[in-house]
Regions:
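Metal-centered catalytic cores of metalloenzymes
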Residues: 28-40, 55
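General structural feature for long, well-ordered alpha-helical segments within catalytic domains
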Residues: 4-12, 35, 39-43, 75
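A structural signal for the main folded, soluble domain(s) of proteins
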Residues: 24, 54, 88-91
Length: 112
């Protein structure tokens, strides 16, 4: 299977463009900020466009979908991920930096 790395990178950069920073003051409500639900709606639409089945989004911002098996012998797999980011991290916009040919050494995030 060939991976379209440019398409994957574009999708990743799209996801990080959403401000999904959590609100510590609003910790009894899920999602805690409107931006989290905006990303959830976007993910739901994208999963539908990709042809997944049983795509749903609930009032708490949980996005679920089913990708049917393409073979009779495959194991069932589940992927779970947060869409929110820490209130201590910048909320956005986030600028990505792509490191090509990573050599395994430390990556300096800020030269200051």
């Amino acid at each position: 299977m060939d991976l379209d790395t440019e398409k994957i990178l574009k999708r990743f950069e799209d996801y990080i463009s959403y401000n999904t920073q959590s609100d510590e003051e609003n910790d009894q409500v899920y999602p805690s900020t409107p931006g989290q639900m905006v990303l959830a709606r976007h993910l739901k639409e994208e999963l539908e466009q990709l042809g997944l089945q049983e795509v749903s989004l609930d009032e708490n911002g949980y996005v679920m979908a089913t990708l049917p098996a393409n073979g009779a012998e495959g194991s069932v797999v589940g992927f779970i991920s947060h869409m929110d980011t820490s209130p201590d991290a910048p909320g956005g916009p986030i600028k990505s930096r792509v490191v090509h040919d990573y050599d395994g050494k430390d990556i300096c995030l800020n030269k200051e």
